[in-house]
Curated annotation (Swiss-Prot):
Residues 1-20 form the signal peptide. One of its GO terms (biological process) is symbiont-mediated suppression of host innate immune response. This is Membrane protein UL148. The gene is UL148. It is a single-pass type I membrane protein. Interacts with host SEL1L. It is found in: Host endoplasmic reticulum membrane. Keywords: Host endoplasmic reticulum, Host membrane, Host-virus interaction, Inhibition of host innate immune response by virus, Membrane, Signal, Transmembrane, Transmembrane helix, Viral immunoevasion. Coiled coil: none annotated. Chaperone protein that plays an important role in HCMV tropism. Cooperates with UL116 to regulate the abundance of gH-gL complexes in virion. Favors the incorporation of gL into virions once UL116 has regulated the early folding steps of virion assembly. Interacts with the host ERAD machinery and slows gO decay which would otherwise be constitutively degraded. Reorganizes the host endoplasmic reticulum and activates the unfolded protein response. Additionally, plays a role in the evasion of antiviral immune response by down-regulating cell surface expression of host CD58. One of its GO terms (cellular component) is host cell endoplasmic reticulum membrane.
Length: 316
């Protein structure tokens, strides 16, 4: 019993910790005006021996198909801190061991640090990983691999240019550091209560306009660099006080490079401009207005006659 209790205490102190970071993505935005970007994570209580630890670039989060660009098994590491240059330019890895490794040789704690130069080539999805047992799999969602996910995205600025009260809603998404490329795909999703959802994927082209029902999508080049996406939505069936969601993304293959998001709520007091109506509706509206005017005139004449009769009777 005491031996079991002692084992449980050792596992609690030095054993692999349950890390909720597998379901969490650490996100950074790329800016050419900033310093190098740093991703890092500390793995605690990693049991030895293990297969390898390292950094990998992932195609997407759904398949977790990742390709390592740096890895080690720590067999050749004698210093507590070492820096490594990777095969990929603009990436540097620092590995730091924690504590006196001779006290508890069966477990290790170390910090993996990845430094990225602020260039668009480094935009993408990354994982710091430890393969605890067996060979490294091609897909990193297996229980034998502990991973921490990171994402470096391009920054997108979202703004509403024309409000819905003008008859159409115009939203612009500016990505200053994005350049046109044949492997980029843009996605736009529009949703709102009482409205049909729109979903469109299209390949980026210079100065193109795409149409889908009552929505127009435009792409233009920004100067000195960057790309602007513009969404124009005509007369959506949206009631006052109800929200409209517009979600914009750009993908390279299945990896998202940037995202813009707008939520617009029509004011409860707003009156949407009416669409063009047929002649029958216009004639019906004219007749109703004419009858209302005639009724008001007749009521005014009756009340005037009653008032005159009352005044004449009082003088007598």
């Amino acid at each position: 019993m005491l031996r079991l209790l002692f084992t449980l205490v050792l596992l609690a102190l030095y054993g692999p910790s349950v890390d909720a970071s597998r379901d969490y993505v650490h996100v950074r935005l790329l800016s050419y005006r900033g310093d190098p970007l740093v991703f890092k994570h500390t793995f605690s209580g990693v049991r030895r021996p293990f297969t390898e630890l390292g950094w990998a670039a992932c195609r997407d989060w759904d398949s977790m198909h990742c390709t390592p660009f740096w890895s080690t098994d720590l067999e050749q590491m004698t210093d507590s801190v070492r820096r490594y240059s990777t095969v990929s330019p603009g990436k540097e890895v620092t590995l730091q061991l924690h504590g006196n490794q001779t006290v508890q040789p069966s477990f290790l704690s170390f910090t993996c640090r990845l430094q990225l130069e602020p260039v668009v080539e480094n935009v993408g999805l990354y994982v710091a990983y430890v393969v605890n047992d067996g060979e490294r799999p091609q897909q990193f969602f297996t229980p034998q691999v502990d991973v921490v996910r990171f994402a470096l995205y391009l920054e997108t600025l979202s703004r509403i240019v024309e409000p819905l009260e003008s008859g159409r809603l115009t939203v612009e998404f500016d990505t200053p550091d994005l350049a046109l490329a044949p492997d980029l795909v843009s996605s736009l999703f529009v949703a709102g209560h009482g409205e049909t959802d729109f979903y469109m994927n299209w390949t980026l082209r210079r100065s193109q306009t795409h149409y889908l029902e009552e929505m127009a999508l435009q792409v233009e080049i920004l100067k000195p660099r960057g790309v602007r996406h513009r969404a124009i939505i005509h007369h959506p069936k949206l009631q006052p006080g109800v929200g409209l969601w517009i979600d914009f993304c750009v993908y390279r293959y299945n990896a998202r490079l940037t995202r813009g998001y707008v939520r617009y709520t029509l004011s409860p007091k707003a009156r949407l401009p009416a669409k063009a109506e047929g002649w029958l509706v216009s004639l019906d509206r004219f007749i109703v207005q004419y009858l209302n005017t005639l009724l008001i005139t007749m009521m005014a004449a009756i009340w005037a006659r009653v008032l005159i009769t009352y005044l004449v009777s009082r003088r007598r």
